Amino acid sequence: MEMESSAASTRFHQPHMERKMSAMTCEIFNELRLEGKLCDVVIKVNGFEFNAHKNILCSCSSYFRALFTSGWNNTEKKVYNIPGISPDMMKLIIEYAYTRTVPITPDNVEKLLAAADQFNIMGIVRGCCEFLKSELCLDNCIGICKFTDYYYCPELRQKAYMFILHNFEEMVKVSAEFLELSVTELKDIIEKDELNVKQEDAVFEAILKWISHDPQNRKQHISVLLPKVRLALMHAEYFMNNVKMNDYVKDSEECKPVIINALKAMYDLNMNGPSNSDFTNPLTRPRLPYAILFAIGGWSGGSPTNAIEAYDARADRWVNVTCEEESPRAYHGAAYLKGYVYIIGGFDSVDYFNSVKRFDPVKKTWHQVAPMHSRRCYVSVTVLSNFIYAMGGFDGYVRLNTAERYEPETNQWTLIAPMHEQRSDASATTLYGKVYICGGFNGNECLFTAEVYNTESNQWTVIAPMRSRRSGIGVIAYGEHVYAVGGFDGANRLRSAEAYSPVANTWRTIPTMFNPRSNFGIEVVDDLLFVVGGFNGFTTTFNVECYDEKTDEWYDAHDMSIYRSALSCCVVPGLANVGEYAARRDNFTGLALRDEVKYSASTSTLPV
């Protein structure tokens, strides 16, 4: 386990974990200790002596309480030899007993945690655990996780283990600790549903890298590791060329039935399509998604809805997670920031809202936060640098050019510079530290103009106009471009889409969607651009499609269960309770697959 040398450090304060003493009492007793006055105990460590007061040490450590009060120790005894700890660590322990603070650094954290564990000083243990959580990175996550084998740090262990699972692909590329895993440890990691890999190829390649580190002693473990790969989810070409023909696999008799079963599962999947049984077969069972796409509210059946659905991209399924106590809302904005989903502005067929609600997806609770300065229906919302930006919209009387931003720490909205144009039914995103807003309706016409906001200068700048007028547009940053998708040009709902290059200040067309739509949800999940629901010119829709910039093609995804437009989407990554929002992997009873699916001409599945 390696951390950056003493570049990072913290002084841990823990006034509430052990018995509390007033600051004045602590200061007085510490002065007495340093002066050697009224001390009634000497702690001896490897020849070093530390004067102290028994009462003070007892107040922070049950170890010292037991040591000083046990029947076999004379209460008059003054000198105690303490084994198993260095003088440096004992010095920190004693200072903590008097001051309730301790400096924690990358250089001392392991020894300090071990010492605190030995003396049962839970305040320091917790402080060290919090420090190690903050230091987690690709290089040390395995070492920190293994470190918790020796000490009771369940929260740190969970945090480190989930860091490994969530960052597996990147960790394998750079971590020396990965190569030192035992076969059991590697097997336990790659069999987890929570393992965050977009393609199972990455799991197989990780196995090969691990074996290649010590091929003579590890090649026989291929038979243990290969069944943990979801082989039937691989592209057939990769499976045939890279897995079936691999020398380690071919040389293993135990791998032959695994390969045969994988081929059967791939055939069934190709011929019959996905089925519920795929969730119980370890070769076809989708991993849990790292990020969940939420589709929130909207207009359905002639009125606003409170429906919330969660999209599981790894399983291509929607899960209804509607909170019945939540009120209906349409033409609102949604944003995810620091663990919360924010629902901003909107319309309920009676009122235009300036209110903002915050949803905790772990606790599943809603709370009202500070309202905006203006009522904003058809609002454009985005997140940048820990602020939520809300721009334009319609307040029930006029289309707005005003904009404001919300800071969660202060629970306040602050007005920023107004835009150059009134824009309702526009859409916004962020790219390279700037806010982009495109299209919309100014009260007279649908707009093809776009502008960018610089947070440092608090100024809006007009950029190159789009190729089409677009109100009810979807705008999202994807790769190195700003994408403007669909919308209404004043006559028709659009299938067209275009991408803006900030470097060249130009727009280029991309392939058209399968379906025209305006007032839909848009987000990026697993490196795919998703468009969700909307209005097609005749009716609200529930269909979903996604665009892959690598193939420059659109693909059909699973329909929502509810027809709706005027919804808003946001993506929530790294949920501790992601299983509650994903399609169930055990005893699956989720949504039935569609009877008919329209696919891109070049493929019959979502790209992976």
UniProtKB/Swiss-Prot annotation:
The modification Phosphoserine is found at residue 501. Pathway: Protein modification; protein ubiquitination. Pfam families: BACK, Beta-prop_ATRN-LZTR1, BTB, Kelch_1. Transmembrane segments: none annotated. It comes from the Eukaryota. SMART domains: BACK, BTB, Kelch. GO terms for cellular component: Cul3-RING ubiquitin ligase complex; cytoplasm. Kelch repeats lie at residues 292-339, 340-386, 388-433, 434-480, 481-527, 529-574. GO terms for biological process: cell morphogenesis; fertilization; homeostasis of number of cells within a tissue; male genitalia morphogenesis; male gonad development; proteasome-mediated ubiquitin-dependent protein catabolic process; protein ubiquitination; spermatid development. Residues 39-106 form the BTB domain. One of its GO terms (molecular function) is ubiquitin-like ligase-substrate adaptor activity. It is found in: Cytoplasm. Keywords: Cytoplasm, Differentiation, Kelch repeat, Phosphoprotein, Repeat, Spermatogenesis, Ubl conjugation pathway. May be a substrate-specific adapter of a CUL3-based E3 ubiquitin-protein ligase complex which mediates the ubiquitination and subsequent proteasomal degradation of target proteins during spermatogenesis. Self-associates. Interacts with CUL3; indicative for the participation in an E3 ubiquitin ligase complex. This is Kelch-like protein 10. The gene is Klhl10.
